[in-house]
Amino acid sequence: MHVLISQMQELFRVHDGPRIINEKHIEQWSHSYGLNRASLYDAIAELALGFHNGTLDYEFCDAVVNDLVGIHFEEDNSLFWQVFLAFDAGEYGHDGDRGVDPVEKYTRPEITRIVSKLTA
């Protein structure tokens, strides 16, 4: 999936706007990698590994998962949904946490937990 993540990085480098990834990209990647949508989303969710090891930044990862949820996704207990929720938690300050970096307090520990399960 490293090639797919690289393709996404290129999309975000050359395009600007609220939604970079669209339905056409999902269909193209599903066909190219021989994956149904749910499997493709879970494969893309492995970008959590890149965030965890410092090769992908929060803003990129959060933008990717937000774009994907915006296209079409049903809430469930998939790897993708867990990763989405982890990045989503870093988008805003939580009650009683003024001055706390939500990415460090909420996203990073949750991504660490997810990655630990993936690599166990």
Residues covered by each model-derived region:
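Acidic, Ser/Pro/Thr-rich low-complexity regulatory regions
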Residues: 1-120
